[in-house]
Amino acid sequence: MISLGLILFSSVLCHVATAGRTCPKPDDIPFATVVPLKTFYDPGEQIAYTCQPGYVFRGLTRRFTCPLTGVWPTNTVRCIPRVCPFAGILENGAVRYTTFEYPNTISFACNTGFYLNGSSSAKCTEEGKWSVDLPVCTRVTCPPPSVPKFATLSVFKPLATNNSLYGNKAVFECLPHYAMFGNDTITCTAHGNWTTLPECREVKCPFPSRPDNGFVNYPAKQILYYKDKAMYGCHDTYTLDGPEVVECNKFGNWSAQPSCKASCKLSVKKATVLYQGERVKLQEKFKDGMLHGQKVSFYCKNKEKKCSYTEDAECIDGTIEIPKCFKEHSSLAFWKTDASDVKPC
């Protein structure tokens, strides 16, 4: 007959053998939750992994049972982001992105001359869909430009709607007697407006003054306006210093103030000089004197080196300074060689 003590001892051994060890809290998986979540589990208890919204399950199984060994089986659970479909091609624009995965955001931008019609960004949602549809890039247009006062449109080619596209230009002209301040050309900008309009202002100039030893002709009218012209001239033996024709400019001044400069009488009777790169006889080429602004080069001797060099002389309003190194060759001293005939240094 089996004793009661032996029976109790056997039952304790059996319980220890079948109870096993408890399992610890399972590994944390990014973007996943465990149900039920406890600090330890008895052998035979089950857990299940669930992915958070926006993520999908990858692995062999999502359910695990705590074994008698107290060690969880190898866990291959992964929760990966949902991937939204290709966003599409934005015509006349660009889609900027790093990835199409949840919860990333993509942005939209239009090329210069187009504006965004729709949202500037879209987010990949938990369902793997984009939060908004692909926008549209619409071409920028400008309304008909305003015409400045006292101006006319000289160049303008609008659309059939009378609007203009980005980059289109309009060119203005001022009415007679009016000068333009600012750029005569305006451009339709990427913002749908025109660049700054110019301004047309009436401009008057004083009557031009007559130069000494000369004359000036201009239109016979009471007032001289912008773009009116005057013509200058000089008396005999005087040379005009400045343009022959001047114009009333936009600032109410004449474009130049010409003057009449006197010719130069030459004290040298005989010399060979350089004029515009050619050797000429001074007494023949300039028998009536040199005009203001004319320049010649006189030949001089370098006695030490026995060679010649040139120095310039210019007629300036009736005055010319003959180089000091120049020595006029006398016809009586026929045995002497003129500096112009000596080899150059």
From Swiss-Prot:
User: Hey, what tissues is this thing expressed in?
Assistant: Expressed by the liver and secreted in plasma.
Query: Which residue stretches belong to region Sushi-like?
Result: 263-345
Gene Ontology terms, cellular component aspect? Answer: cell surface; chylomicron; high-density lipoprotein particle; very-low-density lipoprotein particle
**Matches recorded under InterPro entries:** Compl-Cell_Adhes-Reg, Sushi/SCR/CCP_sf, Sushi_2, Sushi_SCR_CCP_dom
The intrachain disulfides are: C23-C66, C51-C79, C84-C124, C110-C137, C142-C188, C174-C200, C205-C248, C234-C260, C264-C315, C300-C325, C307-C345
Q: Which GO terms describe its biological process?
A: blood coagulation, intrinsic pathway; negative regulation of angiogenesis; negative regulation of blood coagulation; negative regulation of endothelial cell migration; negative regulation of endothelial cell proliferation; negative regulation of fibrinolysis; negative regulation of myeloid cell apoptotic process; negative regulation of smooth muscle cell apoptotic process
Q: Which residues form the signal peptide?
A: 1-19
UniProt-recorded Gene Ontology molecular function terms: heparin binding; identical protein binding; lipoprotein lipase activator activity; phospholipid binding
PROSITE patterns, alphabetically?
Answer: SUSHI
Going by the UniProt annotation, this protein carries glycans at: T33, N117, N162, N183, N193, N253
Q: Where is the Sushi domain?
A: 21-81, 82-139, 140-202, 203-262
Q: Which Pfam families match?
A: Sushi, Sushi_2
What keywords sit in the KW lines?
Disulfide bond, Glycoprotein, Heparin-binding, Repeat, Secreted, Signal, Sushi
Q: Which SMART domains has this protein been placed in?
A: CCP (SM00032)
Q: Where in the cell is it found?
A: Secreted
Q: What does this protein do?
A: Binds to various kinds of negatively charged substances such as heparin, phospholipids, and dextran sulfate. May prevent activation of the intrinsic blood coagulation cascade by binding to phospholipids on the surface of damaged cells.
The protein here is known as: Beta-2-glycoprotein 1
Q: Which gene encodes it?
A: APOH
